[in-house]
Structures are given as C-alpha cells and as structure tokens.
Amino acid sequence: MMLIYQHIDVYAARPVTLRTLMTRLALTLSLFSCVATASAAATATSPIVLHAAHLLEIASGHTLSPGEVLIDGETITAVGTSVPHPAGATVIDLGGATLLPGLIDVHVHLFLHPGAAEDLQTVEESVPQRTLSAILAARADVLAGFTAERDMGTEGAGSADTAVRNAIDQGLFLGPRLRISGNAIDILGGHEDANRFNPDEHLLSNADRANDSGELVATIREQRKEGADFVKIYETGKDAFRDGKLASPYQYTAAQLAAAVAEAARVGGTVAVHAQGEPGTLYAAEAGVASIDHATQLSDATMKIMKEKNIPAVPTFTVFEHFAAEPGPKAARERQILDYKIAEFKKQLAAGIPFAVGSDVGPFPHGTQARELELMVEYGMKPLAVLQADLLNGARLMGMSGQIGELKPGYYADIIAVPASPLDDITAVERVSFVMKGGVVVKGPSAN
C-alpha cells in the first residue's frame, strides 16, 4: 500500500493565534491518523516506477526523454529512458512533466512567520506556539517541493527545532529532511541581542551569547548536546546601509571563528555565518566556514579564498525583495539595499565564486521560496548553474552529498515533477505538481 499525503494549505501568510495554530495542527493530526496504517506499510511497499516526458540530470545538464525512475523502498535503484518494471510494481505516469530531484533550501527559518516583526514574535509568542507554527511551516515547504532544508536558527526558541526535526524523521509530521542549528550564536549587544528594548526588562537575546573563543567552544558543545547538526554564527552586526554601501561591524575575529570551525568539525559538524561586508566576510573565509550567508560586499581577497576553499555564498534575495515590497517609510531604503545586492551578485558571478540557494523564508510565507531560484536567474545566473547550486552545493551543505540532490541509483528517492523544463523556464520550480520524499508520495497523483 502506498502512502499519499494530500495537500491542504494550512500555512497562511497572516499572523496566527495559538487557537488557530491548534486548529490547524488538529487538522494535520487527523490527516495522519487516517493514514497511520498506510504509513507502517509504506516502507514495505512494492517497487514504484515514475514515468514522465522528461528527466533532468543535474550534474551533466542532460535531459532524458522520456524519463523513468525505479524506486525500491526509500531509495532509487534505476534511472533512464526505460527502467525495469518488476512484477507487481506500482507505475505512476506523470504525463508531460519533468522529473528532477527535490529542491534544497539552505537558509530557512521555520520558527518565523509573516505578519509580525521578528523581534515581536520572539517576545510575544511562546516557544510551544512557535513550535506548532514551525511544524506547519515545514509541511508547507515540503509540499512546495523542498525535500531538504537547513534551518538557520530558531531566533530565540532554543533547541525546539530538535523536536521538529526528530518528529519529522519519526514520521509523526510531514516535512523536509532537516539540518538544524538551535539558536544562532552572537556577541553581547550583537545582531540578535535585545538592543532596542528597555534594558530594565532584561529581555533575552534571540541568540546564544559567546564573546570569545572559549565561550564559542562551550556554546557549540551545549548546542550539540541539545541536538544541533551544525552551527550558525552572526559574524556581522546589524546591517547599516550608508552612502550606497554596507557598514556592518564584524563580531568575531578570524581566530575566534577558526576555533568554532575546529570544534564543530571535531564532532562532525560545520559552521555557517551570517556575514555582509568586510572584514567580517574575510574573517569567515579565512576560518574555513561552510557557507557565507547574505554575502554582500565581498572583497577580491575574500572571493579568492572562497574559490580556493569552495565556500558557497548564499545570496537570500527573496527576503530582501520581500522587505523592499513592504509598505512604509523603509521600503525605499530596502529597495536600495536590494539593488546593491544585485550589483554585488553580478561581481561575484564574474569572479566565479560558488553559490548555494537559500531564501531566508520565514518573514515571507513558507512554501513560496522557490522564487529564490527565479531571482538568481533574473539577476544573471544560468538556469542550470542555479539548479546545480541548489542541489549539488545544497546537498554538500546538508552533509548529504551522494544521498540527495541527484537522481541516481542509491540516492534517496526525493523527487519532484514540474510542468516544464526549468532549463527553459526556471519559474517551473514554483509550480511543483508532484513530490516524493524517501519513496513516499506526499503530493500528486496516486498510482495508476
């Protein structure tokens, strides 16, 4: 018996009350109760054959026409224009669609939602309420075709993302494969500290505090104990845009970041940094971080190191586009920042640095972040290069190279179908009609 999760849009773009969240979660739980028996059977299902008009090979850029994938359990066993159809196999014909691997977003915030300022969400909403919201956000993301994500900090919810990841892994809730960081790490008075609030209220930072190398190592150990897969560090402070440039102070030296990278590596993890401007981005590159997120205003020296060490930049255009489109007095300034980021991105493309795809979704609605791929193409990157950045570099940042990001035998059967080739129309990735994660259909037609 094959498990099919039907798509219900339960994640809205407006602020949500705890009562509304509970109602939506109850609906989600009722769906799962209806298919609980099927869930147990899904791991022992008969082989599945997916058939579509086209299949995109990501590494080579070649398109197979038609395309077929044979799935046994949670993994792919064969890919080609024609694959074996074992006796008793379930065949799903997706017609004129194009098959490609499930998308990867390496910069998401499951614990943020649209409609309220981030700092107010973290103060006014309890961690249990935010965790319920995160479960719904994860569901919206996977139904949009994102089968793997890196959650870049709970913004004050501590290690609550550990529970979300574990619940998804255990099949209790629908969501992507997650790599989580718990809270990000920040200095006293840094990017995520409660700087604009009454100091007599003693509000906590939205990040874990570490002021030197020793505190960084201790914090990383504590986060690892609580279930974190990787480390997120704020390397630059609040981003001030003056005279057409960013003026963002660095928060850690290269030596301090190197200590963090070494400690993360000791236990099999990596460090990703929020960083814009110099010398913060240079310090991050010198320390050998896994990725530099936002990554605006990179010097030639920084880009040279990023190329040498294969450190991807993660532009996060979509969240900046969102801020630029919001009504209010800040919109014009946000548009200037976005225009500046676009110009800087073109310089980075010319320099040949690697990229990965991360949207910073959370301030804008979960499930809409495929827009990031479209924007990267619009701003000058070739469609195949964007898909390779998303899937190949994304898999590497997830620590899952050789497991996800391509349709190959032995890889997890994380597969989506879109109505046209994204090589011809990158916006096709915003119209996902079919999603399979680990051999289980979570969106789209059932077996014929």
Language-model features, listed with the residues they occupy:
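Histidine/acidic residue-rich metal-binding segments in metalloenzymes
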Residues: 163, 213-235, 239-313, 335-354
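Active-site mouth loops of central-metabolism enzymes
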Residues: 120-132, 198-217
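Metal-associated gating/positioning segment near the N- to mid-region
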Residues: 97-172, 188, 255, 287
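Histidine/acidic-residue-rich catalytic or RNA/ligand-binding cores of hydrolases
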Residues: 114-115, 161, 190, 241-244, ...
